[in-house]
Amino acid sequence: MCTAATYKTKDFYFGRTLDYEFSYGDQITITPRNYPFSFRHAGTKQTHYAIIGMAHVAGDYPLYYDAINEKGVGMAGLNFVGNAAYANVKPDVTNVAQFEFIPWILSQCASVTEVRELLAHMNLTNTPFSEQFPLAQLHWIISDETASITVESTADGLHIYDNPVGVLTNNPPFPQQMFQLNNYMHLSPKQPVNTFADDLTLTAYSRGMGALGLPGDLSSASRFARVAFTKMNSISGDSEAESISQFFHILGSVDQQRGCCEVTEGKYEITLYTSCCNATKGIYYYTTYENHQISAVDMHRENLDGTTLICYPVIQGEQVHFQN
C-alpha cells in the first residue's frame, strides 16, 4: 500500500510513501540525457529528458517507483492489485511494457498535456522485465504544476482520469475513490456549529471537531480521504524549507508503523520511505522508516549529459542531533 500527493507553493512538489514489508535495495537514481533507453517494443531513445527518482536498478536498468524529469513532470506507480490488467502487443499503436511506463513518459513529456497526447496512441503491455521480476499490478499518478491525471489499465482497457485532488492510493479504482469523498463533504478545519437541533444546547468541547469522522485506519480508501483532506486544507509559506516540511507533514498523516498492518504471520507493512520532489528545481528529498532526517539529491549537481546511471544509496539509521 502506498500514497502519493502533489503540493504547490512557489514551486511544485510531488512525492509518495512506499509502504511494504521489505525493500528491494532501492537507490536514488539519476538517468542522464544520453543514457540509452531500449524499450521492448518502442525502439531506442538515445537522448531524452533527464530523470531522478527512487528505483531498483537491475541489469543497469532503472525500475522506477516514483520520479520526476527535468521539465517538472512527476510520476509514481502504486499497487492496484486485483484490478490492474495489461494487454498483449497490438498493431498500429505504441506498445509500452508496464515496467518501462515511467521512463517512457518522463523521457519525452514536458507537461501533462503532452502525456495525454502520448497516451492516446499507447498500449500498455503485459511484457515482464524478467523471470525474476514478474508484472507488478499498478496504477499511476502523473502530474505537473498545473494538472494531475490517474492512469489505470484494467480488463476493459486503458483509462485516463482527471485527478482534481492530486492524490492517489490503491484500490478501489480511481472513480470510486473520488466518489467516496462525498461521504466527507461536511468535514472542515473550522470548529463546527450546532445544526443537530435548535432545541438542544450543543457545543464543541475540543479543538479539531470540524474533522470528526475523517477516517484514521490504514486502508487505501481511508488514506485517500485523509491525505486529500490534509493536502487540500494545508497552509504553508513559500520558502523551500517551509514547503518541504509541510509536504512531509501531509504524507505523514498516513504513515504506517510496524506492528499495525500485519500482512502475513510476523510480517508487517511499514512506510519504507517518503519522498518529496521539488519538481521545479529537480531535487529529490526523502526520509525512511529508520531515518527521519531529510536527505536530498539534486539532479542539477550532476552531469546530466552523461551516458551512465548515477545512483545514491538510501541513508539509513537515525541521525540524532545532540544539543549539548
Predicted regions, residues:
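A contiguous strand-loop segment
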Residues: M1-V93, H121, N126, C311-I315, ...
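Proteins synthesized as precursors that undergo proteolytic processing into mature forms
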Residues: D92-P128, E240-F248
